[in-house]
A protein has these predicted regions:
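N-terminal beta-loop-helix "entrance" segment that forms/cooperates
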Residues: 21-42
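Active-site-adjacent pocket-lining segments in enzyme domains
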Residues: 1, 10-22, 41, 46-180
Length: 180
């Protein structure tokens, strides 16, 4: 849930137009840890025009969610269409499995939740928190959620916007633990 909702929260703080979309024809989605979330839209409600005007699609992590998304033809079509039109596609945790199914990791650097790289045949795995490779941004897992969101904000709205959100949320300070 962290890797799905942190980007949504940060994007809304940055005044980005955001819609959460459920793939399964129900507005309520349940996270891999049993937390219910109400999506703004369901996948069949997305028109081709809305997809054409999309600047970014974010695929959250978690299993079996990532597998379910990878097995949904319309999800793969949307990812490919947004990418082919010059939009950004991003995935976190197990989400890069979906990007591979869409053919978007070929010849690209990426990161993912440890162990998922063994299932990804294309692309070049790099063990880092966040990787930005052209139109593709990937992140390792829940602990990378803030960095992931800020990387996407910077790519779409500029460094100043990302810095503003980082300051507002104390993101840059959040990983500094006091030694006792």
């Amino acid at each position: 849930i962290i890797e799905a909702m942190t980007p949504v929260d940060f994007f809304r703080r940055a005044d980005m137009d955001v819609a959460t979309v459920s793939w399964n024809n129900r507005h309520q989605v349940v996270s891999s840890h049993g937390i219910p979330v109400i999506a703004d839209k369901i996948l069949p409600e997305l028109s081709d025009e809305q997809v054409i005007n999309t600047d970014l699609v974010v695929i959250p992590g978690g299993l079996p969610g990532a597998t379910n998304l990878a097995d949904t033809d319309r999800v793969i079509e949307v990812l490919q269409q947004v990418h082919d039109q010059g939009g950004m596609v991003a995935a976190i945790c197990a989400g890069p499995l979906v990007l591979e199914k869409a053919g978007l990791l070929k010849d690209r650097r990426y990161t993912c939740y440890p162990g998922c790289e063994e299932k990804i045949k294309e692309g070049h795995y790099i063990n880092r928190l966040v990787i930005h490779s052209d139109q593709i941004v990937t992140a390792k897992g829940p602990g990378a959620s803030m960095h992931f969101a800020l990387t996407l904000i910077q790519a779409l709205n500029g460094k100043n916007a990302a810095n503003d959100i980082s300051k507002e949320t104390f993101a840059s300070e959040s990983l500094k633990f006091e030694k006792k």
